[in-house]
Amino acid sequence: MATLVYFSSLSENTHRFIVRLNLPARRIPLDSSQQLQVSEPYILVVPSYGGGTRHGAVPKQVIQFLNDINNRQLIRGVIAAGNRNFGEAFCLAGDIIARKCHVPYLYRFELMGTSDDIANIYKGVTEFWQRQTAHS
């Protein structure tokens, strides 16, 4: 199975979600001077920021990661985390990345996710990679 790539801020909400998911994953560093390079297809898991506005919804570290042409070419889907308090901007980073990278928006969850989110994403990611492999 291919990997997940994720970003998590100092709050560690997304990191805790990824740990609970128990799938292979690589983390985009908090320190923007450190670069993550991927060499295989991945699904991006990204939190949404900006407090309910479009500006700043995608973390700067994720933008920097996707601005690397190799990293951008290997993205196959996106999953977003967010806060329902942001209203229409809930998980907006996922919408933006899916549109700009022309990949499917696979799932969205709130904060650290629920047990149902974990089960749904685990099943969905596993099936997604099986379909990708079958079409290769």
From Swiss-Prot:
Q: Which GO terms describe its biological process?
A: protein modification process
Reading the lineage from the top rank, the first entry is Bacteria
InterPro entries with a match to the protein in the record: Flavoprotein-like_sf, RNR_Ib_NrdI_bac, RNR_NrdI
Q: Which Pfam families match?
A: Flavodoxin_NdrI
Coiled-coil positions are none
Q: Which GO terms describe its molecular function?
A: FMN binding
The UniProt entry's sequence similarity note says:
Belongs to the NrdI family.
Please describe what this protein does. Probably involved in ribonucleotide reductase function.
Q: Which PANTHER family match?
A: PROTEIN NRDI
Q: What is this protein called?
A: Protein NrdI
Species, as recorded = Erwinia tasmaniensis (strain DSM 17950 / CFBP 7177 / CIP 109463 / NCPPB 4357 / Et1/99)
- Please spell out the taxonomic lineage of the organism that makes this protein: Bacteria, Pseudomonadati, Pseudomonadota, Gammaproteobacteria, Enterobacterales
